[in-house]
Structures are given as structure tokens and as C-alpha cells.
């Protein structure tokens, strides 16, 4: 849940609103939302606080202190990740830190693991080098008792790839099912559209990763030339 993306009136917060030390008014607003979410969900439901890397380290620590009261499962992307700033956040917060969609290689992850800066790693198959590279990152995370939640905010094709990988990981924790995986513009791209039932997925057993793009999606795709 993103508790800090809009003002009380519903206006989106901009970069200047979310950086630096947060005001007492902002903190009061965020805490009221955390409290409401916890009361509505009850004590048996896990809640992840999503920050999209908006605040800097100062504001992230302030938010983490609030989250400690509400048994938040993890603090996702508390700030733009650098080892120095995440180390500062980890030092002053007891909330587990989730991060990784903006880290792109096992060498970047290694620095976070060695310093115990992550409790939940979130590598993205699409920008981390594919299934094999994310498997290597996940195995390295296991050696440091770090859980895995593959970042999965793409098409249903991404969902299939993530599910196949996750079922091989002893340190797999949860599967991300993003809102984009229910949008017509996304679910209409592939032959199959996997959705959870009662909170659980069934791993597909079709050939390959168990899904494929529709020919119509390929024909209508926009092509970008990266280099000549």
C-alpha cells in the first residue's frame, strides 16, 4: 500500500512534497492511513508499505518509525537505493526493507547482502538479465537469509516466468500480483491470463513458460531501434 502518494484532498504529491524531513501534518496523515489499513485488514493480514523510492533517507526513516507500530511486513523501496542511504535507514528502523527493482545485477545485490541491508529482495526478470540471472541473485540471497519476491509488474508473460522461477526457490516468500496484471491493455496481450484463486496461483505446466504473446500483440507492437 502506498500511504504517501496523495494529499488528503486526493491531489498527487510531487517530488518536493516527499523529500527532506516530512512535516508533522504529513506524518499525521500517513499514520492515519496506516492505522485505517491495519484496522480494516485485521492482525492476520500482511501489509507491505510501498514507497516507490519517493522520499529520501531522512523521510524514509520517519515513515519507518510510524510503520513499526502497525506490524508492517516490509518497507518497499523506502528511497532511491544506494548502499549508503539504505544503510542509514536500516540503522534506525526495525521494519524489514524490501528493494531491488532498481538494482540490475548480482554485483549490485552483493553489496546489499554483505551489509545486511535487505530482508526481501525484489529482482525483476525483465531488467536483471533474465531467469538465469535472477536465479543466481536469489541463490546468493539465500546464503544471507534474504527472502525473494520477484518484481512482477508487466504482462501475463512476466507472471508465468516469475511463477516458474519462484517455485524453484527455497527462499521464495510471496508472489507480486500487480494491478497492471488485471488491466485490459495487459491481459489481452497473451494467450493465457493467469489469475490467483483465493490468494494462490497454480504454476502452469504447459511447454516452455506456459504462455505466449498473441500474434495480434506482436503485429501491433511498437518497435524501438536502440543502436544502428
Language-model features: where?
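Shared catalytic-loop signature of beta/alpha-barrel
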Residues: 65, 71-74, 80-200, 204
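Active-site microenvironment of metallo-dependent hydrolases
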Residues: 214, 218-228
Amino acid at each position: 500500500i502506498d500511504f504517501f502518494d496523495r494529499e488528503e484532498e486526493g491531489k498527487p504529491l510531487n517530488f518536493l512534497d516527499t523529500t527532506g524531513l516530512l512535516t508533522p501534518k504529513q506524518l499525521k496523515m500517513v499514520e492515519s492511513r496506516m492505522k485505517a489499513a491495519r484496522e480494516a485488514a485485521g492482525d492476520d493480514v500482511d501489509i507491505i508499505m510501498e514507497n516507490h523510492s519517493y522520499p529520501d533517507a531522512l523521510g524514509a526513516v520517519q515513515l519507518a518509525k510510524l510503520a513499526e507500530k502497525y506490524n508492517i511486513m516490509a518497507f518497499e523501496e523506502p528511497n532511491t537505493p544506494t548502499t549508503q542511504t539504505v544503510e542509514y535507514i536500516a540503522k534506525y528502523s526495525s521494519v524489514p526493507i524490501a528493494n531491488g527493482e532498481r538494482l540490475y545485477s548480482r554485483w549490485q545485490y552483493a553489496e546489499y547482502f554483505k551489509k545486511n541491508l535487505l530482508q526481501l529482495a525484489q529482482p525483476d526478470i525483465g531488467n536483471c538479465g533474465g531467469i538465469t540471472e535472477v536465479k543466481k541473485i536469489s541463490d546468493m540471497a539465500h546464503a544471507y537469509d534474504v527472502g525473494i519476491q520477484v518484481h512482477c509488474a508487466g504482462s501475463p508473460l512476466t507472471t508465468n516466468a516469475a511463477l516458474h522461477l519462484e517455485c524453484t526457490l527455497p527462499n521464495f516468500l510471496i508472489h507480486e500480483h500487480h494491478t497492471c496484471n488485471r488491466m485490459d491493455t495487459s491481459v489481452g496481450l497473451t494467450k493465457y491470463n493467469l489469475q490467483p484463486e483465493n490468494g494462490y496461483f497454480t504454476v502452469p505446466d504447459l511447454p516452455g513458460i506456459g504462455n505466449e504473446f498473441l500474434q495480434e500483440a506482436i503485429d501491433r507492437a511498437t518497435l524501438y531501434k536502440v543502436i544502428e
